A protein has these predicted regions:
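Transmembrane-helix boundary/entry motifs in multi-pass membrane transporters
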Residues: 49-64, 78-96, 131, 142, ...
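Transmembrane helix-loop junctions in multi-pass membrane proteins
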Residues: 33-38, 108-111, 121, 193-206, ...
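Alpha-helical membrane segments and immediately flanking helix-loop junctions
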Residues: 63-115, 144-147, 153-168, 184, ...
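Selective recognition of specific alpha-helical transmembrane segments in multi-pass small-molecule
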Residues: 130-141, 227-243, 254-274, 306-307, ...
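Membrane-interface loop-to-helix entry segments
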Residues: 23-26, 30-47, 181, 185, ...
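Helix-loop-helix module between adjacent transmembrane segments
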Residues: 30-31, 100, 130-155, 166-203, ...
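Extracellular/periplasmic helix-exit of transmembrane alpha-helices
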Residues: 141-154, 264-282, 293-296, 325-328, ...
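N-terminal alpha-helical transmembrane segments of multi-pass membrane transport
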Residues: 1-102, 106, 117-123, 134, ...
Length: 492
């Protein structure tokens, strides 16, 4: 854990987590290598989600006869390895919402409050920059997730970094390295799913519910296990059906959550419209000429980049697991859809939180030492100053954020579990039962070092994933050319 969260001391009070360097450098490299795909591909990605290019898929002419008896030495069905035209399990929109549900959550509320308290308003600017760069990383990893996925005879999809590291690096003559990196990633994603994707989420949700109902005097005080049991049952009902069931829930919850939260943020902003100009002045001045911030401009930049990386997980590889289940015959089409995630998560939702905090005067150094639960209450108070009943809405939102994050991360963890232990029903149910048990534990326990460990697991995923992304970037470029050619042919 200490190795993952080792901080490089730059002097002047500035310490930077080393994991930020490969994430940001990688995102910048992909932005340049793919010629600003995060900008020039933005409207194309929206059109894909809207269904404008559905005719490009031509699925009715590309049905695949799948053998359930012939397999490779690795247990893969050769008819479904990188086969173009197979249906997959979910739509572009469902894959997008499933992946978004794992990232849009408590970090957008609590993490942003802490970031702007430490780094000042200027951290918002660098958070947006990092979010825009991260769009390119998401494009690369999610394109690879579809290209190298496995699809079983019954249509069940298995995908993500485990598969593009194994198959992709094998195609480059690096089979041994690919296998090692894939196993490491699988171990890390399982650890992350039980911790940050499960226990942390339900723990923070329960703390907020307990606080809003009276704190130590609440009727729920001491009954975290009961809250966890209810959440575990709800999670279990959804995850038992796999990605199709998860996507059916997330494609309703995620748009609802984002619309409610952004609408409330805009209400606060417009209610204080006379302060909007000053807020943006604080953001731009603070980004380049901060005063009273540890480490000056570098300190502000670090806080913005850190929050973006922790929030949208671009380069971590998790989202490619959800996107690999999409119904498409062009891998790059889903990569294009995926680049919307950091934009929605960081550029839109995180920025809204930051603006509300700045406008309502809640960006102060005294708040820098807050923990996540306290930071949620700080954000809640900022909204409450304009919308008196908003804390109740935020409580519901936090529960939904936590719930949707848990069901998506259960899928991520299961994919790693299946890669290591096999795709049998016995192994599937073993993982899902364990996952639900950890929901109860997370709600009842005081987590402490467990959270540090789970955070380390999530960012450890970045190491094997980024190695694969850089090596396989030319493959992604080929897929992009193929898809853009198909779109141009459709227009003609």
């Amino acid at each position: 854990m200490n190795a993952i969260f080792y901080q490089i001391d730059f002097g002047g009070g500035v310490k930077i987590f080393w994991v930020l360097f490969p994430l940001i450098i990688g995102a910048t490299y992909f932005t340049i290598y793919f010629k600003l795909i995060n900008v020039r591909g933005f409207f194309t990605s929206i059109n894909i989600v809207r269904g404008k290019y559905d005719d490009v898929e031509g699925r009715e002419n590309h049905k695949v006869e799948v053998s359930d008896t012939v397999f490779t030495d690795d247990g893969d069905n050769p008819d479904t390895i990188r086969v173009e035209g197979h249906e997959g399990e979910v739509s572009h929109f469902q894959a997008l919402t499933a992946a978004l549900s794992a990232t849009v959550g408590l970090g957008n509320i609590a993490g942003v409050a802490i970031a702007v308290s430490i780094g000042g308003a200027g951290a918002t600017f660098w958070m947006v920059v990092a979010g825009l760069l991260g769009m390119a990383s998401k494009f690369v990893e999610c394109t690879l997730g579809v290209k190298y996925r496995d699809i079983e005879a019954d249509g069940t999809v298995y995908g993500g970094p485990m598969y593009y590291l194994t198959k992709g690096l094998k195609s480059k003559g690096l089979a041994g390295l690919g296998k090692v990196l894939a196993v490491l990633f699988a171990i890390f994603v399982i650890g992350g799913s039980f911790g940050g994707g499960n226990m942390f989420q339900v723990n923070q949700a329960f703390q907020l519910v307990e606080n809003i109902t009276g704190g130590n005097e609440s009727f729920l005080h001491g009954y975290g296990w009961a809250f966890g049991l209810v959440m575990a049952i709800l999670v279990g009902i959804v995850i038992i059906g796999g990605i199709k069931s998860i996507a059916k829930v997330t494609d309703k919850i995620v748009p609802f959550m984002v619309v409610i939260y952004v609408s409330a943020s805009l209400f606060v902003i417009f209610a204080n419209y006379h302060m909007v100009g000053d807020a943006f002045m604080q953001i731009f001045d603070g980004a380049f000429s901060p005063e009273g911030v540890a480490g000056g401009a570098i300190g502000v930049l670090v806080q913005g980049f850190r929050r973006a990386a922790f929030s949208n997980e671009a380069g971590v590889g998790s989202a490619s697991i959800a996107h690999s289940a999409v119904k498409t015959k062009y891998a790059a089409s889903e990569g294009m859809v995926a680049l919307l995630e950091p934009f929605i998560d960081t550029v839109v939702v995180c920025t809204m939180t930051a603006l509300v905090l700045i406008i309502t005067g809640n960006v102060t150094a005294e708040n820098a030492s807050l923990n996540d639960a306290q930071a949620i209450l700080l954000t809640s108070g900022a909204f409450e100053s304009v919308i008196s009943w908003f804390p109740y809405v935020l409580t519901v939102a936090v529960i939904l954020f936590a719930f949707s994050t848990m069901i998506s991360w259960s899928y991520y963890g299961f994919q790693g579990w299946a890669y290591l232990f096999g795709r049998t029903k016995k192994m599937e149910y073993t993982y899902k039962i364990l996952f639900c048990m950890f929901v109860v534990v997370g709600a009842a326990a005081s987590l402490g070092s467990v959270i540090g460990f789970s955070d380390a697991m999530i960012f450890a995923m970045m190491v094997p994933n980024m190695v694969g992304l850089v090596i396989l970037a030319p493959k992604v470029k080929d897929e992009l050319k193929k898809y853009m050619k198909a779109i141009k042919a459709l227009k003609v």
